[in-house]
């Protein structure tokens, strides 16, 4: 019984080895060429394979290989742009700072007697530490959220 199983295994491996050795070796992209000593009249030399063999690719178009589909034609009428976010554009250069942000202007001074910081507000200026957003004519809701780039500047 063991001898029978061993012969089946050897026969199976032998068929795999003979397929690889008697068939011409494939080469080039997606294995469309064959490695030969001399290319046929309907083939063209591309590069060298192992053991001084040439990689030969057929000149005649073969339909057994899948070809790349042609590029789609893009018409200019089909291209559209979304201008919905252009209303929030301020026209400022790339400074990343918006005019909608107010900064807290407090002056800190050191008292010479106690060496503690003392914060004073100028009497004519009244500012808040929160970000103020002007009311927009295009929004219908009462509460307006600042843009995502300004979310870090808001203090809730």
UniProtKB/Swiss-Prot annotation:
One biological process term in Gene Ontology: innate immune response
Domain of life: Eukaryota
Biased composition (Low complexity): 111-144
GO cellular component: extracellular region
Keyword Nucleus: no
InterPro entries, per database record: Beta-defensin, Beta_defensin_dom
Signal sequence annotation: 1-20
Record Pfam families: Defensin_beta_2
Region (Disordered): 108-156
Cysteine disulfide partners in this protein: 27-55, 35-49, 39-56
Alphabetically ordered keywords of this record: Antibiotic, Antimicrobial, Defensin, Disulfide bond, Secreted, Signal
UniProt entry tagged with the keyword Secreted: yes
Cellular localisation: Secreted
Function recorded in the entry: Has antibacterial activity.
Family: Belongs to the beta-defensin family.
PANTHER family recorded: BETA-DEFENSIN 123-RELATED (PTHR15001), BETA-DEFENSIN 125 (PTHR15001:SF12)
Protein name according to UniProt: Beta-defensin 125
Species this chain originates from: Macaca fascicularis (Crab-eating macaque)
């Amino acid at each position: 019984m063991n001898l029978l199983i061993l012969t089946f295994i050897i026969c199976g491996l032998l068929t795999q080895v003979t397929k690889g050795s008697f068939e011409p070796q494939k080469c080039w992209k997606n294995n469309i060429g064959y490695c030969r000593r001399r290319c046929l009249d309907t083939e063209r030399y591309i590069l060298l394979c192992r053991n001084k063999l040439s990689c030969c690719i057929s000149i005649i178009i073969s339909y057994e290989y899948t070809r790349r589909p042609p590029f789609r034609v893009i018409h200019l009428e089909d291209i559209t742009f979304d201008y919905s976010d252009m209303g929030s554009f301020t026209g400022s250069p790339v400074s990343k700072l918006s005019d909608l942000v107010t900064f807290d202007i407090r002056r800190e001074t050191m008292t010479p007697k106690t060496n503690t910081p003392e914060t004073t507000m100028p009497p004519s200026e009244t500012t808040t530490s929160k970000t103020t957003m002007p009311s927009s004519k295009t929004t219908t809701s009462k509460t307006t959220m600042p843009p995502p780039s300004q979310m870090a500047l808001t203090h809730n």
